[in-house]
Amino acid sequence: VNSFNGLCTYDENGEIAMDFAESYEASEDGLSYTFTLRDGLKWSDGTDLNANDFVYSWNRAASAETGADYAYMFDPIARKDDGTLDVTASEDGKTLTINLVSPCAYFLDLCAFPAFYAVPQASVEAADGWQDNPGAWCQEAGFVSSGAYTLESWTHNESMVYVKNPNYYRADEVKIERLEFMLSADDTAIYAAYNAGDLDFADTVPTDEIQSLLDNPEFHIIDNLGTYYVAFNVNSDLFAGKTPEQAAAMRRGLSLLIDRDYIVENIGQTGQQLANTFVPAGMADGNGGEFRQNDDAYTYPNADAVGYYDPSDDAYFDNLAEAIELLKEAGYEFVDDGNGNEVLSDATPIDITYITNDGSAHVAVAEAMQQDFAAIGANLTIETNEWNVFLNERKAGNFDMSRNGWLADFNDPINMLEMWTTDSGNNDVQFGR
């Protein structure tokens, strides 16, 4: 729901368009941007919204004291001598000037991303405990916002009700006055509510219902740019005693055991592409082409598959054989199981804890991987938790392997790659920690 807005947004064709900014100018060297804001912008409580709100909000999001997961996204912006962002509002609050460290091809995309939206300073700092809990101001309904809708009521884990914001600058174009949402991690319950006529729209269905819905005109498949993946905790005891080379061989070997084709055909069932790179197919390279391709600058190790391995069903047994050899390199011993298959020796077992949230598709993926690992005698124990517990466990690094996924915030490969810096709030695999 559009409760907040930024300087920029996207039009119906996915192209950058102006939002709270009516125009911008960029310097010839690409190091400076100046946005001119629209006249008459208001917060939902009727107070004025201007460029100073963006100066405050961006510095708040980038501050280590706030601890925002997306603080690293502000790194393209230069810093002043006092450590604050080099972002300045004009005296009248009409213009916002930003100086960058270096030219940034995706800077306007950042200005359309929610982490770069403005938040109301007065409301933020009026909340009890705001200095220790940066989100205290918006944990209940009624908080001040800036978008098309405001949150009227919120029964946590059950429902949310949004109503039209009369102070939104495009309020005359908002045709739906009220939006009611059911909140549930149970996709079976959501689907039942939809079928009962209690919901007009549902964005998830149980895995075992997908096949029966493929020909239903009410069922729509929407493409997303992103990657569903397994995260290895690099500090896990799973890698204790291993050299960096052995740990890398082990991760690749375990990854090659996963039958991605089975997961896509029997669990996803809606045309997902097999992943063999972290940056997904279709992501732009910033120069008018696609990032994931073989060219003069780089050819993928598996050139035919345009990736690091061939994930197709035809390559399954080759991948299995390579996985066993890699695990041997990592120090694991294998024996014949009596049927001509190599399995792990009792002397060098592999026991893995895999965490996931309790959505039916995620659990099904975990169970498929459990069977894949069992093919060589490796044991995968699945721990399932509700969403918030799962997120906390993953962020704390309390796992060997974890289900993970990333839908691109904007169409540039840096969005998939910069999260793996040591100080990134999205560095769930614990690199550098």
Put a short name on every predicted segment.
Residues Q246-Q371:
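Append "and occasionally in soluble cytosolic enzymes with long acidic Gly/Pro-rich linkers
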Residues G135-E140, P166-S212, Q370, N379-T381, ...:
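Ligand-site clamp/hinge motif
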Residues E25, A71-A126:
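Surface-exposed binding/hinge segments that line
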Residues V87, R252, V264-E265, Y316, ...:
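Extracytoplasmic/peripheral linker and loop segments enriched in polar/acidic and small residues
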Residues E22-Y70, T97, A193, P244-Q246, ...:
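Aromatic- and charge-enriched surface segment that lines or borders ligand/interaction sites
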Residues D11, V163-N167, L225-G253, L257, ...:
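A bilobed periplasmic-binding-protein/Venus flytrap-type ligand-binding module shared by bacterial periplasmic
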Residues D11-E15, A112-V174, R178, A196, ...:
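Gly/Pro-rich hinge or "lid" segments in bacterial periplasmic/extracellular proteins
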